[in-house]
Amino acid sequence: VCFFSALLLILTLTVSYIVKKPDIVALSSIPEKNDNNARIFIFRHGERCDRSDNQCISKADGITLVGAEQAINNGEMFNASVSDYAVYSTNTTRTIQTAKYFSGKAVTVLPELSICDGTIFNTLKKVAEKNKNTVIFTHNHCISFIASHMKKWKFKPGYLDGLVMTKEKGKLILDGRLAMGE
């Protein structure tokens, strides 16, 4: 019995070490960071029309009414903490719509933000050079890739889930998963 208990404990510790989850960064903590580093907020788009029975706001490749409402609500929370930022999006209807509903600002569309391999990091650095705070709307597989590649985190983002990164001395640092309501 003692052997099996020890084996179970070792197995549990091994699995918890292997399956790392992202650190949590509270949105409320962002304004407290009075440094000169650029911040990058990377969000997944809102609820997709083509994978939902909810009412669409436009074509099937866009977001639903629920997705638009979530983007507006999250944008209001975000704007209360971080009001000065530039908005970027991949070139899909759903990311562009989410970015517009979230921010109410003009959205810069960069197709290269859809390329979710090692080149994404140079793209992120280039975008961050231009702004103190950058908000990017992309896709779940891009966010999962970034989390896995940078920190070996297992992260399957839901709609409008996001990561926070800092660009410090030319390097990208993945701070964690952004907790909007905290």
What is the meaning of each model-derived region?
Residues 5, 10-112, 116-119, 143-144, ...:
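Active-site-proximal alpha-helix that buttresses catalytic centers in soluble enzyme cores
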Residues 121-127:
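Short, surface-exposed amphipathic charged segments that create phosphate/polyanion-binding patches used
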Residues 80-82, 128-132:
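Glycine-rich phosphate-binding loop signature in dinucleotide/nucleotide-binding domains
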Residues 38-40, 130-138:
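Generic beta-sheet signal
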